[in-house]
């Protein structure tokens, strides 16, 4: 069969390419300037071929990293770094349930059910075997930086050369979402039974109660809150963690979506009934769960309740849009122009953070709002493992999708209320912040996670 003119031309090009081909040993030596030079890569899991800048390939080989990047002016979030590492990140970190002693020693719970230890023995979640916690058991580094118009959030297991590396030690927080108050010891405990979480106590009381467990125990600590949200952003490669849950993986084998809007029902304090930890016992799952239980009124009247759409992030249940949590180490100063500035400490230590004064604290940043009302920020300052609004222009369905409330006050100190309650809807989430309340305030809709 005769070839067409176009086919003959293509064959000639193939022959020409073959004749001009060189063995590796015949190639010219490359210059030491690697700018613009690429190497070819092949992903054995997806079968895809791709290219990478040589400088990035060398960086990955020396210190593998993964993460996301996004432009503050655009809603899309992109994956960067090692796809393989991001796919395996929950396993590499060993995310899941733990029983943690006051000295921070820990035993991993079974990823299939938190009623068993990973070794197969029965696990008591009532506090007798340790605090029922969720967390990770491998330290890592976090990098947050701007480059070519993008904000990057990345993690690695060794320091990345040329970047500021935040060291994240082994950590954990209340796996059921919230801690309970032990009146006998006046301390916070994490349990996994369907009990009433601590509520209607000020952060000053909660802070002291958490620290009674020993060194480096906190209530609603800012770094733990930040890291939880950051891990969700990376694993879902999505800034808005309240995006609908999607059990399907992408073609690259990555998770997508988020952990959902949050609990479908407000906790029943509005009718005088005690709130209840909505326990989900199905291990280190990534899903949206449900819960049925019974609670009581102050007069002893019982009420059956049912919650659905409960986030379960590898064993961390109901961690937002259920009960508000005021941070024990974030402090707001209300400025004369009506804006609010966030103050933190450079490091997290063994001493109590003073919530009654700015003395000794460090200015983190100032929010771009000076009028009263709920806002949806487009961007945040995320230095020092804390977040604070840096740019207006978001919405409930774009960018981070979380709310910030400025009371418009022109003087005074305020606490930072995190995460949102069951009635907050779209405002709630990992970078939700309400700056309306004083540090001595207490509400029935406020609680604490122990970390």
Task: Show which residues each predicted segment covers.
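Short hydrophobic/aromatic-rich beta-strand motifs
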Residues: 28-43, 315-317
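Short acidic-hydrophobic catalytic motif
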Residues: 62-194, 292-296, 312-313, 421-422, ...
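C-terminal, surface-exposed recognition/capping segments
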Residues: 66, 226, 248-281, 323-331, ...
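Short aromatic-cysteine micro-motif
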Residues: 124-131, 155-319, 448
